[in-house]
Amino acid sequence: MLKALATRAAQSLRKSWRQHLATLTLAWVAIVAVDTWRTRDLPQGPAPDAALVMAPSAGAAGAAGAAGSAATPVPTTLAAWRAQHPGQAVAVHFWAEWCSICKLEEPSIASLSTDWPVLGVAMQSGNAEKVAQVQRQRGMAWPTAVDPQGTLSRSWGVRAVPALVVIDPHGQVRFATSGYTPEWAMRLRLWWAQTIPQWKALLPKQ
């Protein structure tokens, strides 16, 4: 009798695990499908260049590499900003001052920006002066371009924030995410975008 009970318990446990596995698989498929749909308009292939107006902060002025005081918006381009980080994968992070999820991501972006080049794009968050004020209040030290009308964001296919675009050292968009992204997932994408071109360069050319 005890053997029969043990057998039934084992069968029930196996069935339970199969059910859990099926549920997790369906959940993962749903997450991937939703993420794919949300990022369907984000750029692929070569990263589109864009004119940028950097918020007047010390970090932005330094990133632009142009003369100007910390109180003056600094014009530059995405290509010029990327050129300051040769051989490195970079991240472009679209956010908004009014976005609560973006605020949750700020500590991750702050940590990420200490190890990787990160460019923020403040979508529909006011002019350069207002964005700079928000940055100072929140301690956002990474360079940020202002996009008061959302024109730049729309040209990149960004319809909701936060969104993260990872560009490899050769200027190719490798990853694009929409919605909250954990820091480890951001770092993994940047590492992958940095490493894969290096590996490909070592392969024998046919």
What does each model-found stretch correspond to?
Residues R14-D35:
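Hydrophobic membrane-insertion alpha-helices, especially the h-region
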